[in-house]
């Protein structure tokens, strides 16, 4: 996702807000769900840190601004309907305000889910090798 693509999302479906799922970039574990407006997404892309729109305070907030447990952005994409945002992030500490890695503490990950990131990484490397072999670090 780039800054130029922000306006192409389906902002009208959620009254200017879209759900933003934050997923651990390495393990694939879902860390939290927040909401973004266009300004929050713009700030997320520009700063490299996850920024949400607080529905209760009606303002932007950077995840980790009080705790120091920021979510560093690895990648941002959307679903097929452009009405949900997926943020792959590197958490700098617990994500949940209750001190747990994920806000979804009751979720039980299977061995397959824990290792799914390996298949994803393999696909990324394979794609990069075939896309630009002359400039690909992985193709050397």
Regions found by a protein language model. Name each.
Residues 1-140:
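Flexible "arm" and connector segments at domain edges
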């Amino acid at each position: 996702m780039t800054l130029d693509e922000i306006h192409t999302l389906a902002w009208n479906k959620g009254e200017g807000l879209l759900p933003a799922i934050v997923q651990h970039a390495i393990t694939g574990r879902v860390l939290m769900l927040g909401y973004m407006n266009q300004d929050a997404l713009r700030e997320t892309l520009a700063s490299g840190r996850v920024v949400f729109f607080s529905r209760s305070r009606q303002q932007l907030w950077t995840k980790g601004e009080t705790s120091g447990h920021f979510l560093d952005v690895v990648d941002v994409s959307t679903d097929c309907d452009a009405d949900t945002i997926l943020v792959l992030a590197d958490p700098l500490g617990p994500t949940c305000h209750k001190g747990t890695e994920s806000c979804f503490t009751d979720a039980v990950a299977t061995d397959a889910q824990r290792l799914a990131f390996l298949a994803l990484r393999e696909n990324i490397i394979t794609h990069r090798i075939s896309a630009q072999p002359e400039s690909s670090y992985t193709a050397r």
